[in-house]
């Protein structure tokens, strides 16, 4: 809830990974709320069991109240630390993405190509939870390569899970 109003799910992935990477059925999701609230706004909710993180972006100046495109992706390659998520983007639009992978060393080592800003946190020497924003997008398909870069203690040393969700607005 944001300001007492429930947010709407745009994109979500919560299925177990296969192919030899860590098979955790962890959730990565993007929710949104169109609001006229200003100033301090309370955000409440229950993250469920285990490690939970909520990142919040405020985006303004866009015409679409609902996403024009959404996508999810998951790494199942047991020789890879990265995964690309692709979605249809509009000229001068905005993409918000969410990702979860195993933790990095040093902390905060995840990168996302084509993003303007990334926010991330490593928790309990186990998982990295991150989000990115890409404003001023081009018309067409935009690819976001999400890379763990510096693995810390991956359950499978040669790969990592990447649980990715993204939504785009114009």
Show which residues each predicted segment covers.
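Primarily extracytoplasmic/secreted proteins
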Residues: 1-170
